[in-house]
Design a protein with these regions (language model features):
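Active-site neighborhoods and metal-handling regions in enzymes and metal-associated proteins
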Residues: 1-599
Length: 599
């Protein structure tokens, strides 16, 4: 079936239930960024495969909202579907709550699966539509009725992450969180986020591609903890370990029953941005809801010394693999056929040679030529194209190791470049180097740092429509908060001070539709630089260790400071990576990291 036929079936179900709109989000029951196959309802209905987007279906129309990363991709994939693309944040584009207010009649009904809608999102819709007395119908998943061959819920084995990687024991983490609960006046903490449950319990799983988590909820009290999980996913050994730390098991779907049974006067802590609407609706009226940012977010974001050291080890392994890949790509292009997809598979095979490699950390982006202008392009058998010995290839990839999570982008010259390609590459590199060299007082937020990366681009009248940096989990999600580097303060719901031990990305870019794209990305860890009478200064240490492409640099555009930073980084790369290379690969790395001189 095509999207037109699928939407017709959904509308038939809506009509039976007298629904005036049906909302289908990207999320699973846990507000995860990446979701298992069972939860890809929006993709099933619309054909749009991006990782962010919301579909609203009306009786005679449909619209899909997505952000700037996916404007080009969505416009292509929605063609012929009858679904209007709503470019979020652009002039004249309504937000979803306002759209629903304007298109649903007085006393109408909006349907959705309340397990997939966050409390915050439901509240925002309710506030906008209240004046028209519009009601919610959230008890039924209508997509399930039209998706005949829907994949089952994943139920892969849960495994333990050794404390030598995590740095803190399960008991220590539980005590930390309970201390925060006490400070916040909460007697119960409902934890629906898969990465938070995994981090807190030092457990990992394989229920979500690219993110080592398992389907679960945790109900935490001062003296007890109940893990709602698919029982067959937990071995007897792990269950015994959990029990010894005061954690008991319950069926996965029991979370709603357990919340509904909370006694009168219970003060329930939950994060409305992450808790689904059905959880909130399950809280008894006699209990009090404390809608607060989860304290686990910041705990998880500030990496332990053990996590930081393990991430350094992971990035050396990853740096070796990506360096070998770039060498292979540059020396094979034009001699053997290479497609975007075959290059992607080659890089994965090189990473898999590393000890303790688990999986990729997201769908790899290997984008040649004009595909590089599609910010989150993913090559497939249908879309992948041959690469030629000219122009640029943008490679944004990452991996999961037992020692940590990686995310790197390198834009590689495959042969001769135009002056425009070199100019754009060099401007992006300058912004990347300037942010990487930041030294700043504690108390700064990502919004304070963002302009360092954008200034060389803004001076040239250029910009990019995505964040400059995102937090990265430890053997968890490649994108996490609360830290974020972005200039647009209006978009930020929650602001976060940059703390020592945080790991985030530094990834400016430029995308010229129909031509090419350039992005350069390192992960950095925040460290203390110095303390003096003015305060505590922080700096950024690069974790990613892979050379930039000298063949793509217009040296005339570099300042003396740029050259100093470039040479210092390349010296660090050579020192870390060269012991693991030999022969032609080592000779190439020597040449790729030789100091640059500008007359």
């Amino acid at each position: 079936m095509n999207p037109v036929e699928k939407l017709a079936l959904l509308r038939a179900e809506m009509k039976k239930r007298h629904l005036d709109a049906y909302v289908v989000v990207t999320d699973d029951f846990h507000a995860s960024e990446y979701v298992g196959a069972h939860f890809k309802a929006r993709e099933f209905l619309s054909g749009f495969t991006g990782s962010a987007g919301t579909l609203v279906v009306l009786p005679d129309a449909a619209a899909l909202w997505t952000d700037g990363r996916y404007f080009l991709q969505a416009s292509q994939q929605l063609g012929g579907s009858g679904i209007e693309l709503m470019r979020m944040g652009q002039p004249g584009v309504p937000e979803i709550p306002a759209f629903l207010r304007d298109h649903v009649p007085e006393n109408g009904w909006i349907g959705f699966d309340s397990r997939t809608i966050s409390n915050d999102f439901a509240r925002s819709i309710g506030e906008k539509t209240r004046e028209k007395h519009i009601r919610f119908a959230g008890d039924e998943d209508l997509v399930d009725l039209v998706w005949a061959d829907r994949p089952a819920l994943s139920c892969e084995p849960v495994w333990e992450l050794d404390v030598k990687y995590a740095g803190l024991t399960r008991r220590e983490k539980l005590a930390m969180v309970r201390g925060k609960m006490k400070e916040m006046g909460a007697s119960v903490f409902v934890i629906p986020s898969l990465d938070e449950v995994a981090w807190l319990l030092n457990l990992r799983g394989n229920d979500v591609l690219f993110t080592p988590v398992f389907l679960s909820y945790l109900l935490l009290e001062q003296d007890t903890a109940t893990l709602c999980v698919q029982r067959e996913a937990v071995s007897a050994e792990i269950e015994a370990h959990l029990k010894s730390d005061g954690v008991t098991l319950a069926p996965y779907d029991d979370i709603y029953r357990l919340v509904a049974a909370l006694p009168t006067g219970t003060r329930v802590l939950l994060d409305g941005e992450r808790a689904n609407y059905r959880i909130l609706q399950s809280v008894p009226e006699s209990a009090e809801v404390l809608d607060r940012t989860s304290p686990i977010q910041l705990m998880k974001a500030v990496k332990t010394p053990a996590e930081q050291e393990n991430e350094r080890l992971a990035h050396i392994k990853d740096g070796v693999a990506v360096t070998r890949f770039i060498y292979w790509l540059k020396h094979t292009i034009g001699k053997e056929p290479i497609t975007e997809l075959s290059a992607s598979k080659k890089l994965e095979s090189l990473r898999a040679e590393g000890e303790h490699y688990l999986e990729q950390s997201f769908d790899p982006i290997l984008a040649y030529g004009a595909h590089g202008a599609i910010v989150h392009y993913e090559p497939t058998e249908e879309t992948g194209i041959p690469m030629e010995p000219r122009g640029l290839c943008l490679a944004d990839t990452g991996a999961q190791y037992l020692e940590g999570t990686t995310d790197i982008t390198r834009t590689v010259a495959l042969g001769p470049l135009t002056d425009e390609e070199k100019r754009v590459y060099t401007l992006v590199l300058r912004g990347h180097l300037q942010l990487g060299a930041a030294k700043f007082l504690h108390g700064c937020m990502g919004e304070n740092l963002d302009m360092l990366a954008r200034t060389p681009l803004w001076e040239a009248g250029l910009d990019f429509n995505h964040g400059t940096g995102h937090g990265v989990g430890f053997v968890l999600g490649v994108h996490e908060g609360p830290e974020r580097v972005h200039w647009d303060v209006k978009r930020q719901k929650r602001h976060c001070v940059i703390e020592e031990g945080m790991i985030f990305s530094n990834e400016p870019g430029i995308y010229l539709a129909g031509k090419f794209g350039v992005r350069i990305e390192n992960l950095v860890v925040v460290r203390e630089a110095e303390v003096n009478e003015y305060g505590r200064f922080l700096a950024l240490e690069p974790l990613t260790l892979v050379p930039y492409d000298r063949d793509a640099i217009d040296l005339s555009l570099l300042s003396s400071r740029d050259v100093e930073l470039l040479n210092a980084y390349h010296a660090k790369v050579f020192a870390a990576i060269s012991p693991y290379l030999s022969g032609d690969e080592l000779e190439w790395l020597k040449a790729a990291t030789e100091p640059v001189q500008v007359c």
